[in-house]
């Protein structure tokens, strides 16, 4: 299956790493993917064994046969999170490949579930509190106690009562984000109109009678402008009432909320990068495009990133299907080359910390090693020691996937290169990925479907190993 696999380890033999990956990948292949209905039934049973109620907050209308969204939102108490993790862990054939936690929500990313077209993963969000900036607008304990049982075949799961569901659906976007989620608005309006007094009574303890009444009547009147105009008063009322009732607790809650958000958003673990390397650009792009499809839901965002989009060097290159000699491109000059390398380094670190508000899996189809191995192709005229030094400063990838081309195939794709140069580049890529990186080497001469499946399994194994270490520390 896999040609070679290596890890950061003091052991020098690659055979040991190869056997380890083959063992893990065979386990993955022996566990067929669940349909959503099969997984949901297993999840209910697992929760029952842990003595937990499975309370689904929204988008449950098609349960258990199908899931209308790309995730499942469940409500539990924060103290129940360890047992919820044990419930997920007990489901045979499911692997936890990602985990993030904030003060108000813990997200698990599970592989082995058919959730979308071609995708094989599902995001499970455990809402731990119903808050804004750490200040509660509704008691999660009261919501769970008032939850209504709903049949799912021979099993039962729970949903919030209509009043609580409507309030949560409205305020989750209005109070937290300052916007209306049109998808839920008709149902919210209907519940508010049918149970106006009950909704006001539910909101009054945290928002006050006047603000709660104004909001409910604006929703019933279908006046979106007035509803959005309530955002400021909603937030101020929530802050004032919490600070007047429990000032020390509220100050601590707000401080912990912002500290948690800063730690989460600027963590190196929020962006995980897999780099696809190899001499054949066409092979790399085909693999990346296919991986993006089947890796959906393996993180909040699964994206592709290319060398050209970061470096600005792509404008110099001919089209990939062109037979023009890429080495005939003009050089940038010494200072221009060095500036380009440094700019790309800064952009890589900037993208590592900024713009990623949730867990992101990035598949990079070309890498800085391309420049190190074939500098002429990119018009680089600077000292190679600067390029190599900058390469060591780049954010580390969690996995390198090297597509090792058969020499004959590489020569047929790159007619402008001599056999000796093609061989040199091939050896250069092999040497680069073996330099202490977590890597896998695949034979690009095999069928494309087989290459993609092997790469997918390697990525899932890597994500699962990293997540397992993280969860052992957390739980």
PLM features: residue spans?
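Post-Walker A helix-loop "phosphate-sensing" segment adjacent to the P-loop in P-loop NTPases
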Residues: 293-304
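A glycine- and Lys/Arg-enriched "phosphate-lid" helix/loop adjacent to the NTP-binding pocket
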Residues: 366-432, 438
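NTP-dependent small-molecule kinase module
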Residues: 229-232, 236-247, 411-475
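Conserved NTP-donor binding/palm subdomain of two-metal-ion nucleotidyltransferases/polymerases, i.e.
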Residues: 22-72, 76-272
């Amino acid at each position: 299956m896999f040609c070679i696999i290596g890890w950061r380890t003091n052991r020098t033999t690659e055979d040991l790493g190869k056997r380890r990956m083959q063992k893990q990948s065979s386990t993955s292949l022996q566990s067929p993917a669940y349909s959503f209905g099969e997984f949901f039934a297993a999840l209910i049973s697992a929760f029952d064994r842990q003595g937990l109620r499975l309370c689904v907050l929204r988008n449950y209308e098609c349960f258990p046969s199908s899931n209308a969204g790309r995730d499942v939102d469940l409500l539990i108490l924060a103290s129940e999170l360890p047992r919820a993790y044990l419930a997920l862990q007990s489901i045979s054939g499911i692997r936890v490949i990602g985990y993030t936690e904030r003060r108000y929500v813990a997200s698990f990313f599970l592989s082995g579930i058919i959730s979308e077209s071609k995708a094989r993963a599902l995001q499970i969000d455990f809402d731990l509190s119903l808050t804004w900036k750490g200040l509660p607008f509704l008691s999660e304990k009261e919501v769970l106690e008032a939850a209504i049982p709903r049949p799912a075949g021979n099993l039962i799961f729970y949903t919030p009562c209509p009043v609580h569901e409507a309030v949560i659906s409205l305020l989750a976007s209005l109070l937290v984000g300052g916007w209306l989620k049109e998808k839920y608005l008709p149902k919210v309006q209907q519940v508010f109109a049918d149970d106006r007094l009950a909704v006001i009574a539910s909101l009054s303890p945290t928002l006050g009678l006047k603000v709660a009444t104004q909001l409910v009547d604006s929703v019933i009147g279908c006046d979106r402008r007035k509803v959005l105009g309530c955002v400021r008063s909603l937030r101020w009322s929530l802050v004032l009432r919490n600070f007047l009732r429990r000032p020390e607790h509220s100050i601590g809650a707000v401080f912990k909320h912002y500290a948690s958000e800063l730690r989460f958003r600027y963590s190196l673990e929020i962006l995980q990068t897999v780099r696809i390397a190899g001499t054949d650009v066409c092979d790399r792009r085909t693999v990346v495009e296919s991986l993006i499809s089947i890796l959906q839901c393996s993180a909040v965002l699964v994206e592709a990133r290319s060398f050209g989009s970061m470096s600005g060097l792509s404008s110099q290159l001919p089209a990939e299907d062109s037979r023009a000699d890429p080495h005939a491109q003009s050089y940038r000059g010494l200072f221009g080359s060095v500036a380009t390398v440094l700019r790309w380094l800064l952009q890589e670190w900037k993208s590592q910390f900024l713009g990623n508000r949730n867990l992101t899996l990035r598949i990079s189809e070309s890498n800085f090693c391309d420049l190190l191995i074939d500098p002429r192709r990119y018009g680089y005229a600077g000292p190679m020691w600067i390029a190599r030094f900058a390469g060591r400063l780049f954010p580390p990838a969690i996995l390198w996937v090297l597509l090792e081309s058969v020499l004959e195939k590489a020569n047929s794709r790159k007619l402008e290169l001599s056999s000796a140069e093609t061989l040199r580049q091939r050896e250069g890529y092999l040497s680069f990925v073996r330099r202490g990186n977590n890597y896998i080497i695949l034979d690009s001469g095999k069928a494309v479907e087989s290459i993609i499946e092997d790469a997918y399994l390697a990525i899932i194994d890597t994500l699962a190993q990293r997540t397992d270490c993280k969860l052992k520390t957390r739980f």
